[in-house]
C-alpha cells in the first residue's frame, strides 16, 4: 500500500543518513524451496566504510540474492500444477507427473510426520459449518476465507489473520499447528509449547519467516560479509 511504501522509503532514508549502503529484492519463499506463495521485500545494508569498492553511493554491490535459491519463479509457474479436485475425505492420490514434489503441501506433511508431531492436535474446531467445509474442492483457494489447500500444490501465504481459514486437503478440519509449521519448513523436531494459546500459536507461525528462506538469506549474508574481510 502507499502507506507501507512511505514507511519503507523513510526507513531507507534513515539507513542512508546513518551511513549505510543497501540492496533490496522482492523475494518469494518458493524460490528457496518453501511450499508457499509468500512475497516479501528484503532489505540488507552494511556501513559504507566497510565496503570499499563494493558500493556505488547508497547502493550496495555484489550481493548475490540468488546464490542459495532452488528455483526461479518462472520455472515454478511453468510446472503443471493441479488446479482443483472434488473433496474426498481420507482420499489417497499420487503426485502428478512433472510437479516438483518437494514444493507440495503433502511432501512437507510427510517430511515432518505431522500426524505424530506434538502440535498435531492443535487446531480450531468449528462450532458449525462442517457441511460448508465438505463442499469446498481440494485446491479451491479462490475465496477470501475458507481456502482448501491442494496436497500436490504449494500453499498460499501461511498467515491466518483477518478471518483467513485454511482447510486440510483431505480432512474435514482446519490445518493443525503441526501442519502450518511444516509449511513454514521448520525442522520436524521444532514444536510450540503446550502453555501457548491456540491463537498465539497460529499468530506466531504466521508471523514467522519460512525456515528455508531465512536459512538461504543467512548463508548469503555470511558469504558476503566473509568476502569483505
Provide a role label for each language-model segment.
Residues 1-143:
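Class I S-adenosyl-L-methionine
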Amino acid at each position: 500500500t502507499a502507506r507501507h511504501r512511505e514507511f519503507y522509503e523513510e526507513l531507507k532514508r534513515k539507513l542512508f543518513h546513518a551511513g549505510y549502503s543497501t540492496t533490496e529484492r522482492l523475494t518469494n519463499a518458493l524460490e528457496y524451496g518453501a511450499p508457499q506463495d509468500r512475497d516479501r521485500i528484503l532489505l540488507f545494508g552494511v556501513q559504507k566504510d566497510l565496503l570499499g569498492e563494493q558500493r556505488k553511493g547508497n547502493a550496495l554491490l555484489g550481493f548475490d540474492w540468488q546464490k542459495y535459491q532452488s528455483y526461479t519463479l518462472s520455472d515454478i509457474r511453468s510446472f503443471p500444477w493441479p488446479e482443483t479436485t472434488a473433496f474426498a475425505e481420507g482420499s489417497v492420490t499420487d503426485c502428478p507427473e512433472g510437479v516438483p514434489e518437494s514444493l507440495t503441501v503433502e511432501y512437507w506433511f510427510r517430511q515432518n510426520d505431522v500426524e505424530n508431531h506434538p502440535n498435531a492436535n492443535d487446531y480450531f474446531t468449528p462450532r458449525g459449518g462442517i457441511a460448508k467445509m465438505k463442499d469446498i474442492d481440494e485446491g479451491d483457494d479462490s475465496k477470501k476465507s475458507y481456502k482448501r489447500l491442494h496436497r500436490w500444490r504449494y500453499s498460499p501465504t501461511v498467515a491466518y489473520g483477518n478471518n483467513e481459514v485454511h482447510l486440510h486437503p483431505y480432512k474435514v478440519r482446519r490445518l493443525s499447528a503441526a501442519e502450518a509449521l511444516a509449511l513454514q519448513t521448520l525442522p520436524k523436531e521444532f514444536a510450540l509449547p503446550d502453555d501457548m494459546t491456540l491463537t498465539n500459536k497460529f499468530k506466531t507461525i504466521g508471523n514467522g519467516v519460512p525456515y528455508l528462506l531465512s536459512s538461504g538469506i543467512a548463508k548469503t549474508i555470511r558469504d558476503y560479509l566473509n568476502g569483505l574481510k
